[in-house]
Regions:
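ABC ATPase NBD Q-loop/coupling interface
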Residues: 62-78, 146
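ABC-family P-loop ATPase nucleotide-binding domains
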Residues: 91-168
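The feature captures the beta-strand-to-loop junction immediately N-terminal to the Walker
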Residues: 36-38
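Hydrophobic anchor residue at the start of the ABC signature
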Residues: 46, 158-160, 179
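Catalytic Walker B motif of ABC-type/P-loop ATPase nucleotide-binding domains
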Residues: 170-174, 179
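Conserved structural motif at the start of ABC-family nucleotide-binding domains
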Residues: 5-7, 20
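Short coil-to-beta microelement around the adenine-binding A-loop and adjacent beta1/P-loop entry
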Residues: 17-20, 77
């Protein structure tokens, strides 16, 4: 069985500046890894390269997910293949409630998989059960996505979104930043 994610001798640059210089990493299904290092060491660059963000160029090496190279895939294709990137600073979405956002994301995935959309009442029960474990209350779920949220609230909501992701590989940038011990 192929590793979930395999990075082979990855070199990448931003403009004319080389950032990643020969990264090798193998992650098997079910494993949890932490990428740590000082500021400017390439952690964010690696996540952006994995997600296929514009402006980041792979100059050598390969990225394989379940044995398939991702280098020629656009970012949306990488997401459909199983890549999930939770950004350090999630954007605010004024006018879009958290519950509506989560349900739209779940239903988009269900439709793509040929499944029926989830019933609203069933979804509310599911969200409340998952959110409870993250100390997220109904008020937070009704608020516009990330609007006026503290750093800890934003991160708690990132974990909530992550819990609804069916992606096989999740890359969370600074996942504990701003979180209180109760989260």
């Amino acid at each position: 069985m192929a590793p979930l994610l395999e990075i082979r001798d990855l070199h990448a640059s931003v403009g004319d500046t080389p950032i990643l210089k020969g990264i090798n990493l193998t992650i098997n299904a079910g494993e949890i890894h932490a990428i740590m290092g000082p500021n400017g060491s390439g952690k964010s660059t690696m996540s952006y390269v994995l997600a296929g963000r514009d402006g980041y160029e792979v100059t050598a090496g390969d990225i394989l997910m379940n044995g398939v190279s991702m280098l020629e895939m656009e970012s949306d294709e990488r997401a459909r293949a199983g890549m999930f990137l939770a950004f350090q600073y999630p954007v605010e979405l004024p006018g879009v409630g958290g519950m509506s956002f989560l349900r739209a994301a779940v239903n988009a995935r269900r439709i793509e998989a040929g499944e029926d959309e989830i019933d609203q009442l069933e979804f509310v029960k599911l969200v409340r059960a998952k959110a409870k474990h993250l100390s997220i209350n109904d008020d937070m779920l009704k608020r516009a996505v990330n609007v006026g949220f503290s750093g800890g609230e934003r991160n708690a909501m990132r974990f909530c979104k992550w819990n609804f992701s069916s992606r096989s590989f999740r890359f969370l940038m600074k996942p504990t930043q701003g979180l209180m011990l109760t989260h």
